[in-house]
Amino acid sequence: MDRLKPQSAVSGLPLATALMLDIFDEPIVFHRAYVPIAGGITAALFLSHAGYACADLPEDRGGWFTRTQNEWERDTGLTRREQETARRQLRERGLLEERRVGMPAVLWYRVNWARLRDSLERQSRSHWAGRLDE
């Protein structure tokens, strides 16, 4: 029966405090419009976060940024396999570019913003055709 008793503390924190910290942790947000374009929710989440990750890059980087697998998992909750699948889907659609640089190789990413915009425009025209006065 002891297994069923609620724990009174986690790492020195009262359980209610630890629970509240988890509940009010930063939410993971993605653009809903990316789901059909990216190939699913996982790829849409990856693409949304990639856009967020490169938002404040210096211009001399040309849009390229780097993230480790652990950083992606920490920031998005996606496992290694989910990341690999999302990356493949995005590469196949021309929405994400990748390159390996250095020794040991570091994986760099770049969102293809022109392709994303074209995809969003096509999707919007199709979705809203005949519903908006233009």
Where do the protein language model's features map onto the residues?
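Short recognition helix of helix-turn-helix/winged-helix DNA-binding domains
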Residues: 1-71, 104
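Charged low-complexity intrinsically disordered patches
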Residues: 1-19, 113-134
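Intrinsic disorder/low-complexity segments enriched in polar/small residues
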Residues: 6-8, 27, 70, 85, ...
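Short alpha-helical interface patches
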Residues: 32-37, 95, 113-121
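Winged helix-turn-helix DNA-binding recognition segment
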Residues: 54-110
